[in-house]
Every structure is written in structure tokens, then in C-alpha cells.
């Protein structure tokens, strides 16, 4: 009879489901007492969202597709009764929402309403907007890879606004350099939190964690990615992220 090849599970299905659902992921982090911005299921209409924010006196939030990645459809929304601002990579083209590799800033209520409604209708979350600490180049967050539960590649993503993904032209910076610019031991606090996250997803080979710190150096986990390992030319102990995964599985580099 033919021998059955041994399968090595690297990403438990339930972990993938949890991390690809922003609401479930936030609830998972909260259940494990890991600091994360307050994240709630969003109303399905712009009017209900504005009423909710006004009632709660929340004037700066992120509205994000509940299922999505790469900042697609993410909207940084400032709301006051007589003034609004929306920052996003999305724009409307012939009635269709198009994601672009740059940020757009909207200030007219009509455009903001259409953009928000498009995202809300498909299912979204509302996340508290905590201002990110800034280094000399601007506000930043950090992508941290945990491979087989261990700290691996990491990089600061320095932008010129609220959304700092690398593919929309945020600049790379050493994570330690960026975190040290905020204050002493900030990097240690960030990596401690990342270890907590990794421990909460046992059996996960690769975990990409997006972490921000506020001006006081307090870390908050923004999102978790079931992969998040596309970080070209970023090395840890001389290995890129794919070498590190092969080493973790087989004890040798690719």
C-alpha cells in the first residue's frame, strides 16, 4: 500500500477564523487580558453610527471592514456635529469603491456618508482611535512576527497619517530605534505583549502582530494576522521570514 505523507499542521483553522474576523480577534485579545483598542460591531447605517458616536462622545474612531486586510476599506473618521473628516485609501469611481495605494482625505459630509455606508453595509467594526506615538519621521506602529511562538522579524512602519501600512508608502525603520525614541523599556513592553498574543494562539507557526504605542509608551495590539510574513529583505539572525519558518519546522534554513 502507498504510504501517506505526514502532514504538519502549521495554522490551526480556528486561529485563522479568529484572526481574519476583526471583531472575534478583538474579543479574543480581551478575553486573554491583552491590551487592544475598544472594538465593537458597527451599526449598518451612517445615521446610526453618527448617533452612536455622538451619544458616546466618541469623536475619533476607525471604521474597518470586519473581514479584510492591507488597509483596504479602513477609514479613520473624525466626527463632530458640525465638522467631519475621513482618511482612507478608498475612493468612489463610477459608484464603485476602489482601493488605491495612497491616502485620501475627505471633508464633505456627502462623500463621507457614501464611503462609510459602503463599508457599513458589508459588515464593519468601530475601533477606538488611539493616537500613535511618533518618531522623527511621523506616527508609527510595529509589525512583529512571531514564528513558532518566538520573537522573529519586526519592523516599524512610519507614516504621515493615521494609517501606516507599508504598501501605502509608509517608511521602514528599525523597530527598536522607533520604540526607543518613545522611551526606555518600551520595546520590552511591546515584545512582552507580543509573547502574550503568541501564547494565546498555541500551535500557530506564523503570527503577524500589528502593535502601536501611545505617547506614554503603552502598547496596544491593533490586529493579528494569520500570516503577515511578507517582509522582503528583513532579517532576524541572518534569516528572512521564510528561512525562519523552515528552520522552525525542520531545524535548517531553506
Predicted stretch roles:
Residues 143-144, 210-212:
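Short acidic loop-to-beta-strand element that houses the catalytic metal-binding Asp/Glu
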Residues 128, 155-158, 209-211, 223-226:
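Active-site proximal loops enriched in glycine and acidic residues that flank catalytic Cys/His/Asp
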Residues 33-35, 57-59, 200-205:
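Short secondary-structure junctions
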Residues 56-166:
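Phosphate-binding site of ATP-dependent enzymes
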Residues 43, 67, 130, 148, ...:
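Short, flexible loop/turn elements at secondary-structure junctions
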Residues 34, 69, 137, 148-152, ...:
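Coil-to-beta-strand transition motifs
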Amino acid at each position: 500500500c502507498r504510504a501517506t505523507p505526514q502532514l504538519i499542521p502549521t495554522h490551526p483553522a480556528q486561529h485563522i477564523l479568529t484572526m481574519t474576523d476583526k471583531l472575534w480577534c478583538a474579543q479574543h485579545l480581551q478575553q486573554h487580558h491583552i491590551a487592544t483598542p475598544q472594538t465593537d460591531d458597527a451599526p449598518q447605517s451612517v445615521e446610526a453610527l453618527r448617533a452612536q458616536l455622538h451619544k458616546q462622545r466618541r469623536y475619533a474612531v476607525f471604521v474597518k471592514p470586519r473581514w479584510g486586510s492591507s488597509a483596504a476599506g479602513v477609514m479613520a473618521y473624525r466626527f463632530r456635529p458640525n465638522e467631519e473628516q475621513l482618511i482612507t485609501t478608498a475612493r468612489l469611481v463610477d459608484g464603485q469603491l476602489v482601493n488605491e495605494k495612497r491616502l485620501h482625505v475627505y471633508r464633505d459630509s456627502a462623500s463621507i456618508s457614501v464611503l462609510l455606508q459602503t463599508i457599513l453595509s458589508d459588515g464593519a467594526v468601530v475601533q477606538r482611535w488611539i493616537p500613535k506615538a511618533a518618531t522623527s519621521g511621523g506616527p508609527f506602529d510595529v509589525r512583529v512576527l512571531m514564528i513558532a511562538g518566538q520573537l522573529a522579524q519586526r519592523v516599524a512602519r512610519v507614516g504621515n497619517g493615521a494609517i501606516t501600512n507599508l504598501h501605502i508608502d509608509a517608511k521602514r525603520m528599525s523597530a527598536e530605534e522607533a520604540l526607543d525614541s518613545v522611551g526606555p523599556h518600551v520595546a520590552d513592553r511591546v515584545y512582552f505583549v507580543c509573547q502574550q498574543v503568541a501564547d494565546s494562539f498555541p500551535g500557530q507557526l506564523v503570527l503577524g502582530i500589528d502593535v502601536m504605542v501611545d505617547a506614554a509608551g503603552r502598547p496596544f495590539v491593533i490586529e493579528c494576522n494569520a500570516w503577515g510574513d511578507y517582509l522582503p529583505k528583513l532579517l532576524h539572525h541572518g534569516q528572512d521570514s521564510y528561512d525562519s519558518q523552515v528552520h522552525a519546522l525542520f531545524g535548517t534554513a531553506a
